[in-house]
């Protein structure tokens, strides 16, 4: 389902964004990003650390998706926020997500 939230400098309550990407070898990855929001009619802003595997993936592959976590997937979304793809390359599968 798509919903237009309009431009907002801050989002309340603070949602958990799930930023997903693929590694160079095609391995899917996802991370939680709490620092972000809708910054324009057609843009979002995400603040992520250079140390994240997702950052490396995005810079190399030039592609990613952003979704919002929902109540039905709290455990799965929490797991991708706790586990690092640098240490757990198959963390999406371990979280229970399928691609």
What is the role of each PLM region?
Residues 1-31, 37-99:
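Active-site-proximal mixed secondary-structure blocks
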């Amino acid at each position: 389902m798509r919903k237009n939230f309009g431009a907002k400098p801050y989002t309340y309550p603070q949602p958990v964004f799930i930023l997903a990407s693929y590694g160079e070898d095609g391995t899917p990855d996802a991370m939680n990003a709490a620092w972000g929001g809708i910054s324009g009619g057609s843009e979002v802003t995400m603040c992520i650390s250079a140390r994240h595997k997702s950052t490396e993936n995005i810079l190399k592959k030039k592609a990613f998706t952003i979704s919002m976590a929902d109540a039905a997937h709290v455990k799965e979304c929490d797991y991708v926020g706790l586990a690092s793809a640098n240490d757990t390359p198959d963390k999406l599968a371990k979280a229970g997500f399928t691609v």
